[in-house]
C-alpha cells in the first residue's frame, strides 16, 4: 500500500511539471517529507515552497513559487482519494485470487462447443438431417393441466392416405420393435406429422402433438374405468394426478419411440409409398382404401388395456339406407401396457371424469368409454355432445370425419 502511495505522488509531481512547462514556468525540485494527512499536505507544502522568499516581496522567484505551490496544493488534495482507490483495487484483486480457477482447457472446449452449435442451422423435424426426440424426458402434469379440455389436433385427409396407408403401415411395423406394434391409426398420425405438403413444423411442436396423443389415451382409460364402476354399481373413485402422469409417460414414451423410428425411415415409408407397396408385393388400389375405411370406423377406445395378448370383438355403428344403425363385429388386437386399474387410486389431487369436456367433433369424439357386448356409455354429468345430456345412457355414434 505504501508503494502505491509513492507512485501516485510521483505521478502528481510529473503532471505538475508538465503543467508548469506549458505555462512557461520551471518547477524546482525540493526534497521534502511525505505528508499523510490531507490538511497537513495542503498547508505544509505551499509554505515550504515559499519559505525562501517570504521577506522578498519583489523577487521574481516569489511569483514562480506561488504558481507552483498552487499546483502542488491541488495535487496534494487528490492524494488521499487516489490512495483509497488503490486500496480498493487491491482488495478486489485479493478476493478474485481466492476464487477457484476453472481449467483453461474446459473453458476453451465450452467456448468452441457453443460456437459450433451457433453455426449449425436450426433444422425442422421434416429436414433430411432428422433429429429425434429424447426418450429421457418425463411429463409431470399438474392437476389443473389434467382438468382441461383437449385441443383438437390436425386431422389427416383420408382421401390422401387411403390408397397407401396399408402398405406404409405394413412397412412401418417391420422397422418397429416387436413391443410397439403400431396401429394404422397411429401410423396415419405420424404420417401427418411428417407430411411435406403441410407447413414444416419444428420438433418442439411435434413433441406437443405427441403429448396430446398420449393424453388422449390416458383420458380414454379414465373414462373406461368410470363406466365400469357405474355398470357394477360401485362407488365412483377419483384417480390421483401422479397415477395419471405414470400412465401418461408410458404412452408418451411409446409415441416418442414410434416417432423417432418413423422419422429415420421417413424417406422409404412415405416419400415413395408406391415403391414400398410393390416391394412388399402389395397394391395401391381401392382394396387398401377399403381396409383403411373399415379400420377408421372402429373407435380408438376399442383397444383393451389388459396384459393379455388375445383378440377381442369390438362393435362399430354403420348407417344403413333405412336410417337405422346396424351393428357389426370387427376383430382387433389389444395393446400391452401397464394396468390402469382402481387398485392404483389415491385421494391426492382427484381427477373426476365428469370434469372432462369432450365433444363429438375432433379427435376427442373417439374417447367414449367402451365395453365389449354393449354399445351404450354412461355419461353421468360429463359434457359429451353426442345427443344430449338428459339421459343417463347415450348410444355411441361414430364421428362424421374419420379420426386418426
UniProtKB/Swiss-Prot annotation:
Keyword Secreted among record annotations: yes
Motif (RxLR-dEER): 48-65
Protein's UniProt keywords contain Iron: no
Alphabetized UniProt keyword annotations: Secreted, Signal, Virulence
Top-level lineage group: Eukaryota
Annotated coiled-coil segments of the chain: none
Cellular component annotations (GO), alphabetically ordered: extracellular region; host cell
Signal peptide: 1-21
Location(s) in or outside the cell: Secreted; Host cell
Protein role: Secreted effector that completely suppresses the host cell death induced by cell death-inducing proteins.
Domain comment, as recorded: The RxLR-dEER motif acts to carry the protein into the host cell cytoplasm through binding to cell surface phosphatidylinositol-3-phosphate.
UniProt record similarity statement: Belongs to the RxLR effector family.
Name the UniProt record assigns to this protein: Secreted RxLR effector protein 12
Originating organism: Plasmopara viticola (Downy mildew of grapevine)
Gene name of the encoded protein: RXLR12
Amino acid at each position: 500500500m505504501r508503494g502505491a502511495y509513492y507512485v501516485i505522488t510521483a505521478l502528481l509531481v510529473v503532471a505538475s511539471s508538465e503543467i508548469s512547462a506549458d505555462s512557461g514556468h520551471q518547477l524546482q525540485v525540493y526534497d521534502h517529507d511525505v505528508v499523510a494527512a490531507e490538511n497537513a499536505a495542503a498547508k505544509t507544502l505551499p509554505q515550504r515552497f515559499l519559505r525562501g522568499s517570504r521577506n522578498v516581496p519583489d523577487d521574481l522567484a516569489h511569483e514562480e513559487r506561488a504558481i507552483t505551490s498552487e499546483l502542488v496544493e491541488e495535487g496534494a488534495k487528490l492524494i488521499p482519494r487516489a490512495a483509497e482507490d488503490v486500496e480498493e483495487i487491491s482488495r478486489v484483486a485479493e478476493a478474485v485470487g481466492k476464487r477457484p480457477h476453472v481449467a483453461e482447457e474446459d473453458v476453451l472446449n465450452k467456448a468452441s462447443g457453443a460456437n459450433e452449435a451457433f453455426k449449425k442451422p436450426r433444422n425442422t423435424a421434416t429436414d433430411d438431417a432428422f433429429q429425434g426426440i429424447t426418450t429421457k424426458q418425463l411429463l409431470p402434469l399438474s392437476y389443473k393441466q389434467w382438468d382441461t379440455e383437449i385441443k383438437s389436433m390436425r386431422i389427416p385427409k383420408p382421401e390422401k392416405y387411403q390408397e397407401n396407408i396399408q402398405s406404409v403401415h405394413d412397412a412401418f411395423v417391420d422397422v418397429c420393435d416387436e413391443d410397439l406394434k403400431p396401429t394404422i391409426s397411429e401410423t396415419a398420425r405420424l404420417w401427418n406429422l411428417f407430411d411435406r405438403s403441410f407447413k414444416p413444423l419444428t420438433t418442439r411442436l411435434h413433441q406437443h402433438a405427441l403429448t396430446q396423443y398420449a393424453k388422449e389415451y390416458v383420458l380414454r382409460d379414465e373414462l373406461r374405468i368410470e363406466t365400469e364402476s357405474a355398470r357394477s354399481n360401485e362407488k365412483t373413485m377419483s384417480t390421483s394426478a401422479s397415477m395419471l402422469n405414470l400412465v401418461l409417460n408410458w404412452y408418451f414414451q411409446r409415441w416418442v419411440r414410434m416417432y423417432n423410428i418413423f422419422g429415420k425411415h421417413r424417406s422409404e415409408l412415405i416419400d415413395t409409398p408406391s415403391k414400398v407397396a410393390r416391394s412388399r408385393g402389395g397394391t395401391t388400389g381401392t382394396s387398401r382404401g377399403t381396409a383403411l375405411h373399415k379400420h377408421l370406423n372402429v373407435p380408438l377406445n376399442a383397444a383393451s388395456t389388459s396384459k393379455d395378448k388375445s383378440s377381442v370383438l369390438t362393435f362399430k355403428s354403420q348407417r344403413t339406407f333405412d336410417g337405422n344403425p346396424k351393428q357389426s363385429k370387427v376383430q382387433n388386437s389389444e395393446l400391452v401396457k401397464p394396468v390402469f386399474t382402481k387398485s392404483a387410486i389415491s385421494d391426492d389431487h382427484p381427477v373426476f371424469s365428469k370434469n372432462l369436456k369432450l365433444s363429438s367433433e375432433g379427435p376427442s369424439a373417439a374417447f367414449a368409454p367402451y365395453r365389449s357386448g354393449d354399445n351404450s356409455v354412461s355419461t353421468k354429468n360429463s359434457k359429451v355432445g353426442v345427443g344430449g345430456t338428459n339421459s343417463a345412457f347415450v348410444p355411441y355414434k361414430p364421428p362424421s370425419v374419420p379420426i386418426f
